[in-house]
Regions:
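N-terminal export leaders
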Residues: 14-21
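Short substrate-entry loop that stabilizes the transition state in hydrolases
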Residues: 139-145, 150, 154-186, 302
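Short glycine-enriched nucleophile-adjacent loop
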Residues: 257-266
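The feature captures the conserved acid-bearing segment of alpha/beta-hydrolase catalytic domains
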Residues: 272-331
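Alpha/beta-hydrolase-fold serine-hydrolase catalytic core, especially in secreted/extracellular enzymes
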Residues: 48, 53, 334-335, 339-402
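Domain-level recognition of soluble alpha/beta enzyme cores
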Residues: 41-148, 351-361
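Alpha/beta-hydrolase active-site loop
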Residues: 197-242
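N-terminal secretory signal peptides
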Residues: 1-12, 24-27
Length: 402
């Protein structure tokens, strides 16, 4: 397939944003060298563990990694002779979790590469643990689980919206997250690491879309009782046959948000989609007749003609919301993790706000827990609440854009 050039890239990598924030000005209150010294000093007596907020749903959460190979196509970056290889994770409502370890936010190898890319000292021990228990049995409800597929942003990784993912799983969804190899920090079972490509060919949103459609095939295989892991690693008890291929939604951040829209246009298996500040480039000029929600921050309809054009193409149920004070990284895990890391680094409040916006991180967490759940509950489970009806006193910062 042909890859979509990623330059000029609307999606911002963490490296660029972290560097810009840490070196905000020549006279910054905390120079990068001093910040690194503060980080090293803080970890000298033991690793500082960052934390993620717990999900609010009634179920414990389980997770399992999957090593996937799409033998139907060559890798668009590695080229002919190399099938497309992906790392994914399935998150789900679980049971019997008491003695099972919690999954890390990223594997140590991937986190080490991620921190090096950001310019931080290599201490993967600081990475947070998620709420999910590795390999826990699936909670049996007597019916199959609705499925969501998550696509990350450019230069990121499949765990970048873990708060949102584990929230949905705690409320009864199976969520499949995928690393888009060569535009992600990804570690394979044999220890091989891949990082975002620095030279062409770059992956574009359409390449992400092809990955997502392959993951949809994997979902159907799991639903039919087939283990898709190429290494044959055992799956959690009850996972085979637990997913409902007739109730599938998709969501993504930034480039992943654009890919979500493109996937829905290409594949009828996705019944509802959510874009988290996706730039909608390349311009989408095809109508979409299924439910779609847009959570804007930096890439608004007013600022981005491509987003405005996409909005006009939504012919089914649609909703556009934006939280006051939100920017591109507000709706993800960074809103929680960057303030914690900033405190360790000695960053100023202004430097932190340059990265995640001025919205209170605790409010950002509640927004990213509540609104995606309400959207998918409405369209995949037909559970109608009132959160999506209009402005809500519990969320005064969330504006509905007509």
């Amino acid at each position: 397939m042909t890859t979509t050039p990623a330059s000029p890239r609307t999606d911002l990598t963490r490296r660029r944003m972290l560097t810009a924030a840490l070196a905000a000005s020549v006279g910054a209150a905390v120079p990068i060298s001093a910040a690194r010294q503060a980080w090293a000093a803080s970890t000298a007596t033991g690793p500082v563990k960052l934390t993620l907020p717990a999900p609010t749903g009634p179920h414990p959460v389980g997770t399992v990694p999957l090593h996937l190979v799409d033998t139907s196509r060559p890798d668009p970056v590695a080229g002919p002779g190399h099938h497309r290889k992906l790392m994914a994770s399935v998150w789900y409502p679980a049971c019997k979790t008491k003695d099972l370890p919690r999954a890390p936010w990223m594997t140590q190898g991937a986190l080490r590469a991620f921190l090096a890319d950001a310019g931080f000292p290599l201490d993967p021990a600081l990475g947070p643990l998620t709420a999910a228990h590795v390999g826990a049995p699936v909670h049996q409800t007597g019916h199959r689980l609705p499925v969501l597929v998550y696509s990350h942003g450019a230069g990121s990784h499949r765990g970048d919206h873990t708060i949102m993912v584990q929230e949905l799983a705690s409320h009864g969804y199976a969520v499949v997250t995928v690393d888009h190899t060569y535009d992600a920090f990804s570690e394979f079972p044999d220890g091989r690491l891949t990082v975002p490509a620095e030279v062409p060919p770059f992956l574009g949103p359409r390449d992400f879309t092809t990955d997502i459609r392959f993951v949809l095939d994997v979902v159907e295989g799991l639903a039919a009782g087939h283990n898709p892991d190429v290494d044959g690693r055992p799956l959690p008890q009850g996972l085979l046959g637990a997913l409902d291929p007739q109730r599938i939604g998709a969501f993504g951040w930034s480039k992943g948000g654009t890919a979500t829209a493109l996937t829905m246009l290409a594949d009828q298996r996705v019944g509802a989609g959510l874009s988290i500040d996706g730039p909608m480039q390349p311009t989408i000029t095809t109508d979409l007749d299924r439910p779609f929600m847009v959570m804007n921050a930096s890439f608004t309809r007013a600022a981005m003609p491509d987003v405005a054009e996409f909005w006009t193409r939504l012919r089914g149920w649609r909703l556009n919301i934006r939280a006051d004070g939100a920017i591109h990284k507000t709706y993800g895990d960074d809103a929680t993790l960057i303030p914690q890391a900033g405190e360790i680094l000695g960053m100023t409040n202004q430097q932190i706000q340059d990265m995640i916006g001025i919205l209170d991180p605790a409010r950002a967490v509640r927004i990213q827990q509540a609104y995606p759940l309400a959207f998918f509950d409405l369209h995949l489970r037909h559970r109608r609440g009132h959160l999506l009806d209009g402005p809500n006193a519990a969320f005064p910062e969330v504006k509905f854009i007509p």
